[in-house]
Amino acid sequence: MGKRDRTEDDEVVTKKVKLDKKDKKEKKEKKDKKDKKDKKDKKDKKDKKEKKEKKEKKEKKEEVSDEEEVAEEKPKMTYTASANTIKSSGEYTQCDDLTNVSQSTIDNYFKEHTITIEGEQMRPTMEFSHVTLDPRITKVLTKFPRPTPIQAVSWPYLLAGKDMVGVAETGSGKTFTFAVPALEHVLSTSGGKGVRVLVVSPTRELAMQIYDNIKELCDVVGLHAVCVYGGVPKEQQRSDLKRASFVIATPGRLCDLIDEGSCDLSKVSYLVLDEADRMLEKGFEEDIKKIIGSTRPTGRQTVMFSATWPPEVRKLAEGFMKTPTKVMIGERDELAANKRITQSVEVLDPRAKEGRLLDLLRQYANDDFKILIFALYKKEATRVENTLTRRGYGVAAIHGDLSQQQRTKALDEFKKGEKNILLATDVAARGLDIPNVKLVINLTFPLTVEDYVHRIGRTGRAGKTGQAITLFTEHEKHLSGALINVLRGADQPVPDELLKFGGHTKKKEHGAYGAFFKDVDMTKKAKKITFD
């Protein structure tokens, strides 16, 4: 090897050494840079955590401050056995008249009306003399003989500012149950201008009905109420909201007004969810959560009413109510029909339904006899309405194809007796308080037995008796077992023709679909399935 070759080798080695040194240096710099970055990230994370903890501590402090402010605004309720006076401070105590009622009388009242209370026990205000309200409100109530069971049991809790869940049949006087304490709440506390009471309802018709009842009370005490629902222009509603203390609303329209900044609910301290189970059925859960989130987070009294008490309603209540008292009138955990309603089911050929309907109308229709007919589909309702009108019957109709103005007019005509027959789809099946409906006719059976119970609940309201006639065909035979259960549960006769479709059902639960019924032939043995 020559000198030149050795020199080249040395240069290569030297170059390699330099490259190695450079690589090591770059790696070291890279490592140092990474360590520095990790150290910075760690510090930032720590600072962020400390900042978050500081913020939470501050918010907690503000929350306590808010609660103290609310406590000053509305002192803590007290419960004694000496008086039932609603004082200007918002205090509730039990009156002497109620204290003097014997315990056996109270026990008999609970037994007679199948009343169950989960939570603190308070005596029911069975007579108007058992509760002292604003004289102007008392004057409105004098047109009624006495509080209904749900009112008698609920008023002590609601007047005391407690959260409450009420589970009772439709037509039990729920509106005044929450409206009377709501008025006392507003009158006895200082909250300034703005919406103080919010009632959320699943349908336009029910919202308007609640509004009509509440407006009567608001007018006598000088408070302003507004009804907010879809299907009509927003302009008037926006204007009315500016001076409203009470808002009765459907979820969809209310959320629209919240989004556009036309409805401020930050001062709402009395919140009512009426027909909570129906709102969940209609898919309003997210809207409800949004609405609740728009009200004041502390110092809010929350009231929920539901015709049934399924798991999804319980879960909703647990999410935003503070240890509510649960009041149940009747056996409500399982689907049950009002026992004051005489139910009869006729099994017939689908083509014979309209002929049978005409027979029933010839038998029952007169000027003093209000009849509510339920159809399943809008087109069916329109066709039957035209048929009955041609036959000379005075028929009003409400269904989804009609405008809000047309539906309101139809309901008014029926309520006032201008027309004695109301034809409806299930839009009117829940919550509507139509006085003195003597007969409900199910021309077409609904999609669920739950809807059947709510349909027939339009009669037999407020302690009165009623009648329901259902035309049942083989198209609905998959619901026969569940219907039989309802009939038997209400001590009603079950026709042999219905039993032929199948007399037993098993109630199943599915995570996605909820509770449903499956037809089962109990005479057959279960099949054993094996897999290879």
UniProtKB/Swiss-Prot annotation:
Limits of the Helicase C-terminal domain: 356-502
Protein name listed in UniProt: ATP-dependent RNA helicase DBP3
E.C. number(s) listed in UniProt: 3.6.4.13
Catalytic activity: ATP + H2O = ADP + phosphate + H(+)
Function (record text): ATP-dependent RNA helicase required for 60S ribosomal subunit synthesis. Involved in efficient pre-rRNA processing, predominantly at site A3, which is necessary for the normal formation of 25S and 5.8S rRNAs.
SUPFAM superfamilies: P-loop containing nucleoside triphosphate hydrolases
Free-text note regarding domains: The Q motif is unique to and characteristic of the DEAD box family of RNA helicases and controls ATP binding and hydrolysis.
Native source species: Yarrowia lipolytica (strain CLIB 122 / E 150) (Yeast)
Motif Q motif, chain ranges: 126-152
Domain Helicase ATP-binding: from-to ranges: 155-327
InterPro entries found in the cross-reference section: DEAD/DEAH_box_helicase_dom, Helicase_ATP-bd, Helicase_C-like, P-loop_NTPase, RNA-helicase_DEAD-box_CS, RNA_helicase_DEAD_Q_motif
Positions occupied by motif DEAD box: 274-277
Keywords: ATP-binding, Helicase, Hydrolase, Nucleotide-binding, Nucleus, Ribosome biogenesis, RNA-binding, rRNA processing
MF annotations from Gene Ontology: ATP binding; ATP hydrolysis activity; mRNA binding; RNA helicase activity
Comp. bias intervals (Basic residues): 15-58
EC category: hydrolase
Pfam families registered for this protein in UniProt: DEAD, Helicase_C
Localisation: Nucleus, Nucleolus
Family indicated by similarity: Belongs to the DEAD box helicase family. DDX5/DBP2 subfamily.
A cellular component term, taken from the record's GO annotations: nucleolus
GO BP field: rRNA processing
Binding site for ATP: 168-175
Region of interest (Disordered), ranges: 1-78
